[in-house]
A protein has these predicted regions:
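C-terminal catalytic-base region of ester-bond hydrolases, centering on the histidine
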Residues: 159-227
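Short, surface-exposed "cap/lid" segments of acyl-processing enzymes
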Residues: 30-65
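Short, well-ordered alpha-helices that flank and scaffold nucleotide-derived cofactor binding pockets
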Residues: 53, 57, 109-110, 213
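N-terminal secretory signal peptides that target proteins for export/translocation
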Residues: 1-6
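Sec/Tat signal peptide C-region and signal peptidase I cleavage site
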Residues: 25-29
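Serine-dependent carboxylesterase/thioesterase catalytic core
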Residues: 33-39, 62-66, 71-160, 176
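Bacterial N-terminal signal peptides
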Residues: 11-22
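Short, structured coil segments at secondary-structure junctions
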Residues: 59, 116, 184-187
Length: 227
């Protein structure tokens, strides 16, 4: 876990010994769903500093970024479930980047998160795996392997259960996760943002704008194609 950084500079409130970063906003009464941000492989909550601050500038928006316990998506999904319960949220939107999109989808699909999640957004998520992860231990990122038992189970049955708005976004310059692997089968919004590399999803403004449309809903929530 990264050492403490300048909290004043980040403008965040730090809870639970850096396991959670909350980006405070003025007037958090009635308003949009809270947004939960899930980081990628070997990262932590601070990966969302830029997007978190952008969300914090929107009216009435509660935004929380978690630091996951490790790189096992099953354990991470359970941790997400427990943190949502601890936060007392009855509705939320969830955004995951890279491997974090798998941890988030495990929570949505396998742990009944679909009952309270309004929008699920995947940024460069390897939904159907990447070969480069096949060299990693299962609990250290190997679950992202195309042939992992985790992905086989996760992708069995309906990819997009419930009344959730599903968006999968891919950066046109992402050479880590192929576009074909980022898509979900049935009822998802597919978006490509040109010239975005795999490490830039959390900071790119066009990606942020697409995420906002997805979590806000409405008739124009999908800036891409729904299939």
């Amino acid at each position: 876990m990264r050492p403490a950084r300048s909290i004043r500079r980040l403008g965040v409130a730090v809870l639970s010994v850096f396991s959670l970063l909350a980006y405070p906003v003025a007037g958090q009464a009635a308003g949009p769903d809270p947004v939960l941000l899930i980081h990628g492989w070997r990262a932590d909550a601070s990966a969302w500093d830029v997007m978190g601050q952008r969300f914090a500038a929107l009216d009435g928006r509660t935004v929380v970024a978690l630091t996951l316990p490790g790189n096992d998506n099953v354990v991470n999904g359970q941790y997400i479930r427990d943190q949502v319960a601890a936060l007392g949220w009855s509705r939320l939107d969830i955004v995951g980047v890279s491997m974090g999109a798998l941890s988030a989808r495990y929570y949505v699909k396998s742990l009944n998160g679909a009952a309270i999640v309004d929008a699920y957004v995947s940024l460069g998520g390897p939904q159907y795996g990447i070969m480069s992860a096949c060299f990693l231990p299962q609990s250290q990122g190997g679950q992202m392997c195309t042939y992992s038992s985790f992905l086989k189970a996760l992708n069995t049955g309906d990819d997009t259960p419930g009344a959730v708005r599903y968006m999968t976004l891919w950066g046109g310059s992402d050479t880590t996760v192929p576009q074909s692997s980022t898509k979900l089968d049935g009822g998802a919004c597919y978006v490509t943002v040109p010239k975005v590399v795999h490490t830039a999803y959390e900071e790119d403004v066009a990606v942020f704008n697409a995420v906002v449309r997805a979590v806000d809903g409405g008739t124009t929530w999908c800036p891409g194609t729904i299939k």
